[in-house]
């Protein structure tokens, strides 16, 4: 079923959905951007057409909804623990194909990577549905086609936006019920980006042994250049839809130090101190070493463990956000070239 709705009808649809669902979509945080006169496009709850930013790539990904930047896990009072309440009311997220594909990576990390699933993540994940925002063309720095994340069928509805409104392809009954009486029938089948200006070739395309790739790249000189270029700000990780690193710490209340709460907060493998250990020991002290660790995880180590897909989805946000204009897509191609050269020299 497909229909065409106007901006006013879209707003009415969101109002209907908001009665039961929490609806999140890319929206502008006024003057919250990198410069004083720019907005920050982040995921927020929306109430209508005017709140939605559909013509630009969001600066932050929807993982801020399902894995909040900071959250309380539980409260403690001497010998007792109380699990923090989680709002489990259902959620609808308007997202692009790359970000919907990123959810399978988060699901693996939080639900399958180890013997226990993450309690807080699982509570939210069970109640989330997606509405696909169709990309009519590739944005700057995207390389989703190379990563195989330009397409998805994991959505309840798909929408193609324009200034005149939206074409809607409906797959799930709850969307069909909410949109009842709105719009006009239309001929619409979602389409997906088939090419990007940026293209990458991952190391596993030239070598099928992830340990061999790791051995070749761990001490390769290509990382040395980033010791001076990378400033270790962590912006690439905060914008990434598949990063899952966090720190856990306790907050004791001033009134009674035996009472408090345990929180977890986003962390970054690109920031100094992330790998520090007791006794003053640390790993990856140089920026280039930290970048190597992140790059190998995104396009080698994760797939070696998962066995299905790379962690990187090619959204290009790391390239968009880097103040030093370091291109992750170029790094991937450099990694592949280094592996290809090493294999040729061994032959």
UniProtKB/Swiss-Prot annotation:
Signal peptide range: none
Entry keyword annotation includes Magnesium: no
Positions contributing to [4Fe-4S] cluster 1 binding: 230, 233, 236, 240
Keywords: 4Fe-4S, Cytoplasm, Electron transport, Iron, Iron-sulfur, Metal-binding, Repeat, Transport
Induction statement: By sulfite. Repressed by oxygen.
Residues at which [4Fe-4S] cluster 2 binds: 312, 315, 318, 322
PROSITE patterns (UniProt xref): 4FE4S_FER_1 (PS00198), 4FE4S_FER_2 (PS51379)
InterPro entries in the record: 4Fe4S_Fe-S-bd, 4Fe4S_Fe_S_CS, Helical_ferredxn, Sulphite_reductase_A
Domain 4Fe-4S ferredoxin-type: 219-251, 302-331
SUPFAM superfamilies assigned to the protein according to its UniProt record, in alphabetical order: alpha-helical ferredoxin
Keyword Metal-binding: yes
Coiled-coil positions: none
The record's free-text note on cofactor binding: Binds 2 [4Fe-4S] clusters.
Subunit structure: The anaerobic sulfite reductase seems to consist of three subunits.
Top-level taxon: Bacteria
A single GO cellular-component term on record: cytoplasm
Localization in the cell: Cytoplasm
Principal subcellular localization: cytoplasm
Protein name per the record: Anaerobic sulfite reductase subunit A
Pathway: Sulfur metabolism; sulfite reduction
Protein's gene: asrA
One of the record's GO molecular function terms: 4 iron, 4 sulfur cluster binding
Names of the cofactor(s): [4Fe-4S] cluster
Record function comment: Electron transfer protein for anaerobic sulfite reductase subunit A.
């Amino acid at each position: 079923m497909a229909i065409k709705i106007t901006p006013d009808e879209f707003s009415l649809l969101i109002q209907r959905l908001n009665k039961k669902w929490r609806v999140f979509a890319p929206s502008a945080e006024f003057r919250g951007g990198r410069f004083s006169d720019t907005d920050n496009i982040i995921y927020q709850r929306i109430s209508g057409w005017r709140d939605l930013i559909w013509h630009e790539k969001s600066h932050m990904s929807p993982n801020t909804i399902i894995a909040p930047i900071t959250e309380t896990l539980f409260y403690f009072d001497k010998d007792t623990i109380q699990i923090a309440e989680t709002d489990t009311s259902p959620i609808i997220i308007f997202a692009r194909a790359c970000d919907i594909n990123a959810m399978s990576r988060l699901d693996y990390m939080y639900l399958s990577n180890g013997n226990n699933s993450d309690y807080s993540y699982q509570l939210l994940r069970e109640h989330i549905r997606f509405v696909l925002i169709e990309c009519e063309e590739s944005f700057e720095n995207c390389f989703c086609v190379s990563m195989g994340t330009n397409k998805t069928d994991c959505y309840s509805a798909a929408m193609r936006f324009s200034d005149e409104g939206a074409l809607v392809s409906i797959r799930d009954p709850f969307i069909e019920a909410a949109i009842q009486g709105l719009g006009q029938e239309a001929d619409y089948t979602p389409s997906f980006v088939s090419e990007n200006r940026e293209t990458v070739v991952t190391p596993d395309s030239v070598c099928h042994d992830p340990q061999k790739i790791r051995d070749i790249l761990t001490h390769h000189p290509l990382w040395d250049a980033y010791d001076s270029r990378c400033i270790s700000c962590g912006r690439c990780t905060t914008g990434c839809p598949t990063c899952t690193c966090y720190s856990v710490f306790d907050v004791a209340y001033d009134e009674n130090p035996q009472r408090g709460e345990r929180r977890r907060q986003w962390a970054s493998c690109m920031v100094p101190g992330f790998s520090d250990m007791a006794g003053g020991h640390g790993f990856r002290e140089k920026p280039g070493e930290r970048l190597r660790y992140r790059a190998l995880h995104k396009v080698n180590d994760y797939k070696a463990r998962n066995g299905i897909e790379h962690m990187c989805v090619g959204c290009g946000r790391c390239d968009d956000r880097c103040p030093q204009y370091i291109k992750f897509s170029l790094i991937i191609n450099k990694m592949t070239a280094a592996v290809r050269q090493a294999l040729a020299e061994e032959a």
